[in-house]
Amino acid sequence: MRDFLTEEQVKTLKITHRSLRHKKLADRIKAVLMLHFGFTYSQISQALILDEVTLRRYLENFQEKGVDGLL
């Protein structure tokens, strides 16, 4: 999966990520951004130490509710 976010969505995610102090919430945003930039679920799973089912749920939540679905 690659290039599925608009520039505005990437900007919003990055701004939100910088403002978060809670690691789990930040990881959710990182996961969505990494998918957008072409990382595979497997690569993200290894990097963030999360299982692929969880990553897919994060993406689904984002697609349904936007940034609020990740928080």
What residues fall within each predicted segment?
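Short, basic alpha-helical/linker "hinge" immediately adjacent to a nucleic-acid-recognition surface
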Residues: 1-71
